[in-house]
Amino acid sequence: MEEVTELAELDAMIVVDEAYAEFSGVSVIPLIEKYPNLIVLRTFSKWAGLAGLRIGYSISHSEIAKRMMAIKQPYNVSTIAEAAACAAIRHRDVGLRSVNLLVLERER
């Protein structure tokens, strides 16, 4: 986290890939409020097992989010991927239970 804080002090956009955040328990999301140049990327590929659907999201300052929405392509997410992501969110507890089991096995 210290490295990200140092980078976020620069006059540049800083993008952090948190694809494995659910497995590590570490996130820089709390830094976004202080550093509006910080963008965090998350995916449903790992914790929810949706790798083939290529769906994820970003977390950023509202101004950055507005800019990204203005330039995104229409229909950039398939209906199937969107439905699967919504189901993963609704049943997040099930997915996170699996993550916790994997983490316990890793630490064993």
Region spans (language model):
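Active-site pre-lysine segment of PLP-dependent enzymes
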Residues: M1-I14, E18-W47
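PLP-dependent aminotransferase class I/II
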Residues: N37-R108
